[in-house]
Curated annotation (Swiss-Prot):
Domain of life, source organism: Bacteria
EC numbers, comma separated: 6.1.1.18
Record-linked NCBIfam families: glnS, PRK14703.1
Keyword Membrane part of the UniProt annotation: no
Protein's cellular compartments: Cytoplasm
One MF term in the entry's GO annotations: glutamine-tRNA ligase activity
Protein's name according to its UniProt entry: Glutamine--tRNA ligase
Catalytic activity: tRNA(Gln) + L-glutamine + ATP = L-glutaminyl-tRNA(Gln) + AMP + diphosphate
SUPFAM superfamilies named among the record's database cross-references: Nucleotidylyl transferase, Ribosomal protein L25-like
Motif ('KMSKS' region): 268-272
Gene name for this UniProt entry: glnS
Disulfide partners: none
Subunit-structure text: Monomer.
Length: 555
C-alpha cells in the first residue's frame, strides 16, 4: 500500500487535493487555535489530529495559536498544559508558538479601517439592550440609536475606549452589517469590548480586546493559513469570517471549513459542565482519570497512539453524531493487549495455604512478559506455600461452567503447580479467611503425569513476597449514555466510577513507572498513578478492563 493509499480520506482532504491539483494552493498551512481558558479534552484531540495530521501528510505546516482575547478567563497554566498535550499526542507546531495577542496592533488598525469605511461604530447600548435589539430567529433586530454616528465621532469614541475613557460595559465597537439578516451572527456583531484586566502576554497595555469572530479570521490571514478548520457550531460564523476579510485591506483570504465535533457517550464535553465537576469536587481535578481531558486520559493510562487511532477511526464528517465509549476503550485495549507487559496482582485477596509444600521454602518460577512476544523476555516470580488468590476464584460449590478453584477439585496456578482445595477456615460472620490446599509437586508448568485434565487457571501472588498495592478501579463517570441531555447531569454521575481496593502485586511491580501500563493477568490494564503513588505506596489505576462489561450489562 502506498503512502497516499494509507492516508485517511474525508471531505476536507478531498478539498485540499482539489486545491493543490488546481494550483489554488501550492502548500497546505493549517492551525490549531485553542483558547487558554481550560484543559484540552478528547474533542480537542480530534481537532489536533486533523490539523496537525493534514500538515504532516501534505508536508505542510500547522501553527499552534492561542486565541487569547479574554484576559479574565485565561491563564499561563492553561498555555503550558495545552503545549504539553499537543506534544504528548505526538505533534509539534511549525515555528514559534503564536498568540492572537501578537496581532493586537494590527487588529486595532483593521478596526479603525472599518470605522473609516463606515462599516463599524461605537455603541453605548448596555449588553442587555444589545441582546434585546438583536431580535430572535423569527423576528428581525432593530438598529441601535448610536448606529448612524459619523466616522469622526466613531474614531474619537473608539480612541476613548482604547485609552480607558469608558467603564466596562458602557461602550463597544460593532460592525455595521444588517440588523434584519436571517443570520443573527450578522446583526451588527460586537468587534471590541472593554476589559480592565491584566493580560498574561501583553500586561496592561490594552483595555479593549477583540472578539473571537473578528480576531481569528484576521489571524488566519496574517499567518497565511490555507484551510481554516472549525467545528460545525461555527458554520454560520463563516459569513462573518468572510465579511471581515472582504472589507479590510489584507492580501490573503483563507477559507473556513466546518466538520462535526466529537460527542462521546457517558461523558460531557461542555467546558462549563467540566468546570462544575471540578469546582464542586465531584472529581479530584482536571486530570482526574474519569475526566475526558487529555491529561485525565493520560493519567488513567491511555496512550497517545490509542487516542490517535481513535480519532482516525471515527473520521471527519459534516454530520453530528455520538460515538460509543466502547470505541475509545477498544482502541486502548487493543494497544495495551499488543504492547503491555504482563504481571500478576490480586485485587480482592484471600489467603491460600498449600499444606504439603515445604514449610518456609520458596522458589522462582519463570513467566513470559508477553505470551505472544518472546522478544519481550521473561521474569522470575517467587512462589511459596502461602499465596494470595482473588476471592472470586474460589467457591465451595459451583456448576460445571465455573472453571476456577472449587472445594475438592483442582485448578492450575498460572505458570506454577496444580492444586486441590481441601478445606477452609471462616470468621464469625461466615466469611472465608483461609483456603487450605494440597499441590502436585510434579506439575510445575506441565500437565499431571497420569493424564488427568485440569482446565482452570488462576493467578496468584506469593504472600511472603507480595507488594501491598492500592488499586483504583476507574469506570465511566456517568451511568447513562447521554448525561448532557439529563435535566440535572450531576444526578446521573455513576456512584461506582471509582472503587478503591487494597490488594497485592508481584515484586516486579516495584519497578513500575507512571505512564507505563501493565496487563494484570485476568483483571485488566493498569498503570502507576502519577499523583498518589510514592516509593512507599504503590497506587495503580485501572485503564480499561479486559472486555466491555457495559455491553454485557446492556444485553
Amino acid at each position: 500500500m502506498s503512502e497516499a493509499e494509507a492516508r485517511p480520506t474525508n471531505f476536507i482532504r478531498q478539498i485540499i487535493d482539489e486545491d493543490l491539483a488546481s494550483g489554488k494552493h501550492t502548500t497546505v498551512h493549517t492551525r490549531f487555535p485553542p483558547e487558554p481558558n481550560g484543559y484540552l479534552h478528547i474533542g480537542h484531540a480530534k481537532s489536533i489530529c486533523l490539523n496537525f495530521g493534514i500538515a504532516q501528510d501534505y508536508q505542510g505546516q500547522c501553527n499552534l495559536r492561542f486565541d487569547d482575547t479574554n484576559p479574565v478567563k485565561e491563564d499561563i497554566e492553561y498555555v503550558d498544559s495545552i503545549k504539553n498535550d499537543v506534544e504528548w499526542l505526538g505533534f509539534h507546531w511549525s515555528g514559534d508558538i503564536r498568540y492572537s495577542s501578537d496581532y493586537f496592533d494590527q487588529l486595532h488598525a483593521y478596526a479603525v479601517e472599518l470605522i473609516n469605511k463606515g462599516l463599524a461604530y461605537v455603541d453605548e447600548l448596555t449588553p442587555e439592550q444589545i441582546r434585546e435589539y438583536r431580535g430572535t430567529l423569527t423576528a428581525p433586530g432593530k438598529n441601535s440609536p448610536f448606529r448612524d454616528r459619523s466616522v469622526e465621532e466613531n474614531l474619537a469614541l473608539f480612541e476613548k475606549m482604547r485609552t480607558g475613557g469608558f467603564e466596562e460595559g458602557k461602550a463597544c465597537l460593532r460592525a455595521k452589517i444588517d440588523m434584519a439578516s436571517p443570520f443573527i451572527v450578522m446583526r451588527d456583531p460586537v468587534l471590541y469590548r472593554i476589559k480592565f484586566a491584566e493580560h498574561h502576554q501583553t500586561g496592561n497595555k490594552w483595555c479593549i480586546y477583540p472578539m473571537y469572530d473578528f480576531t481569528h479570521c484576521i489571524s488566519d490571514a496574517l499567518e497565511g493559513i490555507t484551510h481554516s478548520l472549525c467545528t460545525l457550531e461555527f458554520q454560520d460564523n463563516r459569513r462573518l469570517y468572510d465579511w471581515v476579510l472582504d472589507n479590510i485591506t489584507i492580501p490573503v483570504h483563507p477559507r473556513q471549513y466546518e466538520f462535526s465535533r466529537l460527542n462521546l457517550e457517558y461523558t460531557v464535553m461542555s467546558k462549563r459542565k467540566l468546570n462544575l465537576l471540578v469546582t464542586d469536587k465531584h472529581v479530584e481535578g482536571w486530570d482526574d482519570p474519569r475526566m475526558p481531558t487529555i491529561s485525565g486520559l493520560r493519567r488513567r493510562g491511555y496512550t497517545a497512539a490509542s487516542i490517535r487511532e481513535f480519532c482516525k477511526r471515527i473520521g471527519v464528517t459534516k454530520q453530528d453524531n455520538t460515538i460509543e465509549m466502547a470505541s475509545l476503550e477498544s482502541c486502548i485495549r487493543e494497544d495495551l493487549n499488543e504492547n503491555a507487559p504482563r504481571a500478576m496482582a490480586v485485587i480482592d485477596p484471600v489467603k491460600l495455604v498449600i499444606e504439603n509444600y515445604p514449610q518456609g521454602e520458596s522458589e522462582m518460577v519463570t513467566m513470559p512478559n508477553h505470551p505472544n512476544k518472546p522478544e519481550m523476555g521473561s521474569r522470575e516470580v517467587p512462589f511459596s506455600g502461602e499465596i494470595w488468590i482473588d476471592r472470586a476464584d474460589f467457591r465451595e460449590e459451583a456448576n460445571k461452567q465455573y472453571k476456577r478453584l472449587v472445594m475438592g477439585k483442582e485448578v492450575r496456578l498460572r505458570n506454577a503447580y496444580v492444586i486441590k482445595a481441601e478445606r477452609v477456615e471462616k470468621d464469625a460472620e461466615g466469611n472465608i479467611t483461609t483456603i487450605f490446599c494440597t499441590y502436585d509437586a510434579d506439575t510445575l508448568s506441565k500437565d499431571p503425569a497420569d493424564g488427568r485434565k485440569v482446565k482452570g487457571v488462576i493467578h496468584w501472588v506469593s504472600a511472603a513476597h507480595a507488594l501491598p498495592i492500592e488499586i483504583r478501579l476507574y469506570d465511566r463517570l456517568f451511568s447513562v449514555p447521554n448525561p448532557g441531555t439529563a435535566e440535572d447531569f450531576l444526578s446521573v454521575i455513576n456512584p461506582e466510577s471509582l472503587v478503591i481496593k487494597q490488594g497485592y502485586g508481584e515484586p516486579s511491580l516495584k519497578a513500575a513507572v507512571a505512564g507505563k501500563a501493565f496487563q494484570f493477568e485476568r483483571e485488566g490494564y493498569f498503570c502507576l498513578d502519577s499523583c498518589y503513588a510514592t516509593a512507599d505506596k504503590l497506587v495503580f489505576n485501572r485503564t480499561v478492563g479486559l472486555r466491555d462489561t457495559w455491553a454485557k450489562a446492556g444485553e
